[in-house]
Amino acid sequence: MLKREGKVQPYTKTLDGGWGWMIVIHFFLVNVFVMGMTKTFAIFFVVFQEEFEGTSEQIGWIGSIMSSLRFCAGPLVAIICDILGEKTTSILGAFVVTGGYLISSWATSIPFLCVTMGLLPGLGSAFLYQVAAVVTTKYFKKRLALSTAIARSGMGLTFLLAPFTKFLIDLYDWTGALILFGAIALNLVPSSMLLRPIHIKSENNSGIKDKGSSLSAHGPEAHATETHCHETEESTIKDSTTQKAGLPSKNLTVSQNQSEEFYNGPNRNRLLLKSDEESDKVISWSCKQLFDISLFRNPFFYIFTWSFLLSQLAYFIPTFHLVARAKTLGIDIMDASYLVSVAGILETVSQIISGWVADQNWIKKYHYHKSYLILCGITNLLAPLATTFPLLMTYTICFAIFAGGYLALILPVLVDLCRNSTVNRFLGLASFFAGMAVLSGPPIAGWLYDYTQTYNGSFYFSGICYLLSSVSFFFVPLAERWKNSLT
């Protein structure tokens, strides 16, 4: 028998405000404490080169593992959410990040740091970031771009974290700085408590039928669709006791905008199945939804994943190597840290403006996204011309503005393109493939430096990846026509 525990306030439409702004605050803090500290790895990069006398390629693996796991662990995060719930998953992620930084303070080698500063914070970041992103999409629709931009602007606060990190390293050495980073990340435990579950009532109720379960869906584009989940032997979730008594079975309706909640923690934990057999059926249904092969038949999945993969690969190369390149040009490391600060300020402002403009719906969001990617590519191809501090600052300003513009639109563009697919599965699988590329990005850039003894090749590589990442969005109209021809 199905029972619902706890009282969840039902709504007939997405809030676009209210408690949703508390979710944005949590998402903002995730970007400040986790993503912001990830970006300050550029400063630790130089310190580790001196401390462990490693090559750029070897040390690049630390940042590469940290960055890629945030994406690669996407499917794992969805499974953990299904088991523990979104709030608990986020709290677990905060503890993992904290533990990673604390253990890293005892590091004696680069391989040790690859595990403690690469794997653990990367895995914890995946838990924190994906949960916050998915919950945000549940609370916002019309203001999704703006709310996401405000949340992601926290990443831009590296303009405070960069000099602060350098100050901590000078004052307490790199070991003390990592201990303090762990303490700071622990603040995400109470902020994760803000992740209150939400349930959106479906306007067109449709029950689970005898031949497979049919879920009423209202996607991001407000098109009514149906997701059919064929369970083992096409069986349905029924109250076995009620059925034997000859009473009608109960229907369960889930709106598509919140359909992932059915197999995510908040709703899953309120559904208690008394029969082990029925529990197995629901678990099987969840796994099939999580690894839904229908995504591989969706052209929009390929369009988004291609762009997401290459843009994330390109983004972390200049981020990690900017300070190191400034040092090779004879610029003092403290002055170089100001480059990161300026980039953080402008990226923050750019994200908020980009999100607000996109929410006006003057043109489709992916057009803005595509334009920013092209501009990022051109900027990085011109980066080797910046050989003095003023020119390097000019490059930093341009790149921060354009990067902030496209970063603010990743989640809104995903929601627009995923259509009938739930955000959790679409984002998780796309992130997995993107993470595989991000894993190789910084080491490749480091190898290029070790081979050429200049960072020019790294920035050329980043620029080419940005230009290639924009190509897939030119196929969106073609994919839309193909989709329309099937209906």
Curated annotation (Swiss-Prot):
InterPro entries with a match to the protein in the record: MFS, MFS_dom, MFS_trans_sf, Proton-linked_MCT
The entry lists its GO molecular-function terms as: monocarboxylic acid transmembrane transporter activity; symporter activity
Instruction: Give start-end positions of Basic and acidic residues composition bias.
Output: 220-237
Q: Where, per UniProt, does this protein localize?
A: Cell membrane
Q: Where are the transmembrane segments?
A: 17-37, 60-80, 88-108, 110-129, 144-164, 175-195, 300-320, 338-358, 373-393, 395-415, 426-446, 459-479
Major localization class: membrane
Recorded family membership? Belongs to the major facilitator superfamily. Monocarboxylate porter (TC 2.A.1.13) family.
Give the protein name, as stated in the record. Answer: Monocarboxylate transporter 5
Species source reads Homo sapiens
Gene name in the database record = SLC16A4
